[in-house]
C-alpha cells in the first residue's frame, strides 16, 4: 500500500510544477502585454512586476483584470489566449495548493 508521505510528496511535486507553469505563463503574458496592451502594461508596472520592489496594488490590478475577464473585449487573439491560459493555470494551482494543504493536515 502507498504511504501517506508518498502521496503528500507526489501532491507537492505536482503543485510545484503547476505553480512554475503558472508563473511562466504570467511572465509571457506580461511580455506580450507590452505590445498588445501598453496601457495595462503600465498600470500593472510591467517592468517591476517580478521584482522585490513591485507594487502589490498594481499586481492586484492585473488579478482583477483577469478575474473579471476584461480581456474578452481585446482585439489581439494571442493576448486573450495568454490571459485565458494564465487564468486557468491560476485556478488549477490554487486548487492543487488547497488539496495539498488539506492532505498535509489529514495525513
UniProtKB/Swiss-Prot annotation:
Q: Which domain of life is it from?
A: Bacteria
Q: Where is this protein primarily located? A: membrane
Looking up InterPro entries in the UniProt record yields: Universal_stress_protein_B (IPR019598)
> What Pfam families does this protein map onto?
UspB
> This chain belongs to which protein, by name?
Universal stress protein B homolog
Question: Where are the bilayer-spanning segments?
Answer: 6-26, 86-106
The record's subcellular location field reads: Cell inner membrane
Its record classes its membrane topology as:
Multi-pass membrane protein
